[in-house]
């Protein structure tokens, strides 16, 4: 059995984030084999992770890896924004997006499986639930990306043009959040909903007006709605005198697609109730 030195305990502590006594105990049990000790601690980390699995992870970070021809967007969630700013979390996210890009993954499932051991160590170390939520890979003639403060990530695929142009359009997408690429992609249902809302809001204004005037008012609103909802019709944020579609055409490009991730989209955040939390802690203490 190898000697359990202070240096060995320190190394295990740095690699796992566990307490000194826990590290010494794990090394003793593993006969001084640090890798075996880590494996054993993963098992205990998995127990801790299971306890955290019910906690809502709605904060986190977006990461991007690209090479001008392909890009991967990745969202990794944490429970608090504080953890998302810590080096351990950042390292996990960076390693995950690098692997996803290198392995040309198009879905999160294989990445989740590959990174599970590292995730469990991170959960055990930080005490927070951490999840790889989603991943997207895009490829094309020209690919440009934009990352806004690790909270919003965008990848734009162009046919023709330049990476710089694609990056400019990606920055616009981050700021303006279009729902569609083209007006023709807006569903009839979405148009009808917009029409119904417009009629409801302007009911008084339309009273007594001829039908043709009402139709023109509706057509004007729908036209504005299509321009607001579709990327190519939006005014470019850097130069509102030109649309994004015209900008692309001027740069000799056609916009093929855009992908936009924002941290926590669609996740219902848990609102903590302090009284309920205290009651739950007291109930748990009684059961121990």
From Swiss-Prot:
Gene3D superfamilies: 1.10.286.20, DNA helicase RuvA subunit, C-terminal domain (1.10.8.10), Elongation factor Ts, dimerisation domain (3.30.479.20). This is Elongation factor Ts. Belongs to the EF-Ts family. It is found in: Cytoplasm. Residues 80-83 are annotated as: Involved in Mg(2+) ion dislocation from EF-Tu. Its main location: cytoplasm. It comes from Pseudomonas fluorescens (strain ATCC BAA-477 / NRRL B-23932 / Pf-5). Associates with the EF-Tu.GDP complex and induces the exchange of GDP to GTP. It remains bound to the aminoacyl-tRNA.EF-Tu.GTP complex up to the GTP hydrolysis stage on the ribosome. GO terms for molecular function: translation elongation factor activity. The keyword Heme does not apply. It comes from the Bacteria. GO terms for cellular component: cytoplasm. HAMAP family: EF_Ts (MF_00050). Keywords: Cytoplasm, Elongation factor, Protein biosynthesis.
């Amino acid at each position: 059995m190898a000697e359990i030195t202070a240096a060995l305990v320190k190394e295990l502590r740095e690699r796992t984030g566990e307490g000194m006594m826990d590290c010494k105990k794990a090394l003793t049990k593993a006969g001084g084999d640090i890798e075996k000790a880590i494996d054993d601690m993963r098992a205990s980390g998995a127990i801790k992770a299971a306890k955290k699995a019910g906690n809502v992870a709605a904060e986190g970070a977006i990461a991007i890896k690209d090479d001008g021809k392909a890009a991967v967007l990745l969202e990794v969630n944490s429970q608090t924004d504080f953890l998302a700013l810590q080096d351990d979390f950042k390292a996990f996210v960076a390693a995950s997006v690098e692997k996803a890009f290198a392995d040309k993954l198009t879905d999160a499932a294989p990445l989740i499986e590959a990174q599970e051991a590292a995730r469990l160590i991170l959960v055990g170390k930080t005490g927070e639930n951490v999840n790889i939520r989603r991943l997207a890979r895009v490829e094309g003639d020209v690919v440009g990306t934009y990352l806004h403060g690790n909270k919003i990530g965008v990848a734009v695929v162009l046919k023709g043009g330049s990476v710089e142009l694609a990056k400019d359009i990606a920055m616009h997408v981050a700021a303006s959040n279009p729902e569609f690429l083209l007006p023709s992609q807006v569903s009839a249902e979405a148009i009808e909903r917009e029409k119904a809302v417009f009629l409801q809001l302007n009911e008084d204004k339309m009273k007594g007006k001829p039908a043709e005037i009402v139709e023109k008012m509706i057509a004007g609103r729908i036209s504005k709605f299509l321009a607001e909802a579709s990327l190519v019709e939006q005014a470019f944020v850097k130069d509102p005198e030109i649309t994004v579609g015209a900008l692309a055409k001027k740069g000799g490009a056609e916009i093929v697609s855009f992908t936009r991730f924002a941290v926590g989209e669609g996740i219902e955040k848990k609102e903590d109730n302090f009284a309920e939390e205290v009651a739950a802690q007291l109930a748990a203490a009684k059961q121990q």
